[in-house]
Every structure is written in C-alpha cells, then in structure tokens.
C-alpha cells in the first residue's frame, strides 16, 4: 500500500514545519511526516525549509547566521497567523518527541545542505535518531547526494533517499552508487513512469514522488503503485486511498 507522508507537517492547512502542523499531521491518517533540518549558528538542528528566513517568518537573513535562541523570538506562522497565532521554529528533538508517541509513525528527515553544507549535520542527526531509537521508522533524504554517502558510513542500516528536481536516467542504477534505497523525484518531472517504478521495485528499491497535491496526481500515483507520496494535504490523500481500495 502506498504510504502517505505529510509534507512539512500539514503544509496545506497549517504553517509549514511547525509543531501545530506536525500535531495535525499526526491525526490526519497519514503514515508519516516529512521535515527539513538546518544548523543554526550555535549548531542546533532547526526544522525549517528555506535557507532564508524571509518567506516563512517575520525575520530576515539566513538560518545559519542566528542562534536558536534568536530564532525562537521570531514568528513562523506567516500566512496562518489569524488561524494559529504566533508559532516558533521547532528543534528536531521537539518534533521527534511528539511523533514518537505514536508507534510505527514514519519520519523522513531531509538534510537541507545542498546550498550551505552545514559540516557536522549528519553526525547531529545520527545522534537524534539514536537518542529517540527510531532507526526502524526513519529515512534520511537530501538533494546533496554526497551527504547521503557520508550518512551511509555513519549509519549503514538507515534507509536513505535521493531527492531530485530533474529526471535521473536509470535511477535504479544510480541509487546503488551511494548507496540509497529510495528515489524521491519531483512529480512535475517526467521521471515517474510505470517502467521506472517496475525497475526500482525489481531491485528492491522504493519511489516516493513529491509534492503530490491534486486529486488527479494522487490517483495517478496510487495507480502506478509508488511506495509513498509527499503531500501538503494528507487528509485528502488518505480519503482518496480509502476510496480506491
């Protein structure tokens, strides 16, 4: 059965990558969440997508140039302020504390280190995975495929996934070079086909496209038999999956 991941929490209805979004994702019927981590100036794992604070907070500048205590003073509610009030950028440990309350709930941690390298981010994520004992239900993804190769050396038993905005020719072969098990392509690309899904499955690999939001996209991906989807509207995807059973 195709797993449904709540993209950045419940991004369609709540401020992305915030505790309120993750709380609602937890009760949406989704099988897991996806979140993004970056390192603050003082080496904390902040959960935020953009390298710049401007789009999703009332602050300006780069995440890496602020300590976490400074970031906490900002408001990350952006366009949802009237519904949620002010909310803060959470730490990875806060999110893991929440979601580990539900057994089997999956967590996709995306390392946002393709623009700024954030040396040591792999080791810090490893520490959190071990602390919360979620090795059996976590996957780590990144657009920085060299970072995934490093993570494999640190935790060879953890599932890794290659993120890409472009089409990768023979992704089943490419994944083996890292090595990674998961292929996470952009739904807007031309790389999600029956042939690609079959080739990956033949090598015991998995495919989880992003970001799958419309009813048509969701139905198409479920019909293709992809292993998972990332969606801003997990409740919608869960409903469609139930209807298609």
UniProtKB/Swiss-Prot annotation:
One of its GO terms (biological process) is lipid metabolic process. The keyword Hydrolase applies. Disulfide bonds: none annotated. A divalent metal cation binds at residues 34, 36, 110. Inhibited by EDTA and various organic solvents such as chloroform, toluene or benzene. Gene3D superfamilies: Phosphatidylinositol (PI) phosphodiesterase. Optimum pH is 8.5 with bis(pNPP) as substrate. The keyword Ligase does not apply. Its cofactor is Ni(2+); Co(2+); Mn(2+). Optimum temperature is 55 degrees Celsius with bis(pNPP) as substrate. Its EC number is 3.1.4.46. SUPFAM superfamilies: PLC-like phosphodiesterases. It catalyses: a sn-glycero-3-phosphodiester + H2O = an alcohol + sn-glycerol 3-phosphate + H(+). Keywords: Cobalt, Glycerol metabolism, Hydrolase, Manganese, Metal-binding, Nickel. Its ability to hydrolyze DPHP into PHP suggests that it could be applied to eliminate DPHP in the environment. Could be applied for the degradation of other toxic organophosphates to bioremediate the environment. InterPro entries: GP_PDE_dom (IPR030395), PLC-like_Pdiesterase_TIM-brl (IPR017946). GO terms for molecular function: metal ion binding; phosphoric diester hydrolase activity. Belongs to the glycerophosphoryl diester phosphodiesterase family. Glycerophosphodiester phosphodiesterase hydrolyzes glycerophosphodiesters into glycerol-3-phosphate (G3P) and the corresponding alcohol. Can hydrolyze the model substrate bis-(p-nitrophenyl phosphate) (bis(pNPP)) to p-nitrophenol. Can also catalyze the degradation of diphenyl phosphate (DPHP) to phenyl phosphate (PHP). DPHP is an aryl phosphate ester used as a chemical additive and an industrial catalyst that can easily spread to the environment and exhibits toxicity toward organisms. This is Glycerophosphodiester phosphodiesterase. It comes from Bacillus altitudinis. The gene is bagdpd.
């Amino acid at each position: 059965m195709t797993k449904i991941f709540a993209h950045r929490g419940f991004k369609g209805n709540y401020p992305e990558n915030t505790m309120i979004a993750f709380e609602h994702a937890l009760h949406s019927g989704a099988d897991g969440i996806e979140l993004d981590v970056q390192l603050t100036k003082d080496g904390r794992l902040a959960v935020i997508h953009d390298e710049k604070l401007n789009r999703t907070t009332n602050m300006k500048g780069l995440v890496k140039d602020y300590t976490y205590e400074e970031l906490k003073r900002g408001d990350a509610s952006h366009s949802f302020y009237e519904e949620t009030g002010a909310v803060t950028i959470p730490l990875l440990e806060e999110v893991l504390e929440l979601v580990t309350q539900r057994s089997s709930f999956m967590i996709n941690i995306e390392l946002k280190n393709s623009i700024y390298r954030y040396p040591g981010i792999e080791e810090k994520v490893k520490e959190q995975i071990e602390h919360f004992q979620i090795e059996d239900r976590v996957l780590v993804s990144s657009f920085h495929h060299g970072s995934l190769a490093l993570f494999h050396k640190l935790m060879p038993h953890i599932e890794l996934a290659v993120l890409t905005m472009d089409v990768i020719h023979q992704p089943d072969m490419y994944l083996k070079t890292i090595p990674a098990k998961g292929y996470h392509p952009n739904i807007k690309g031309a790389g999600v086909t029956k042939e690609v899904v079959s080739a990956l499955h033949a090598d015991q690999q998995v495919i989880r496209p992003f970001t799958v939001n419309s009813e048509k996209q969701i139905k198409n991906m479920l019909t293709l038999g992809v292993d998972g989807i990332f969606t801003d509207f997990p409740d919608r995807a869960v409903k469609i999956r139930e209807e298609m059973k």
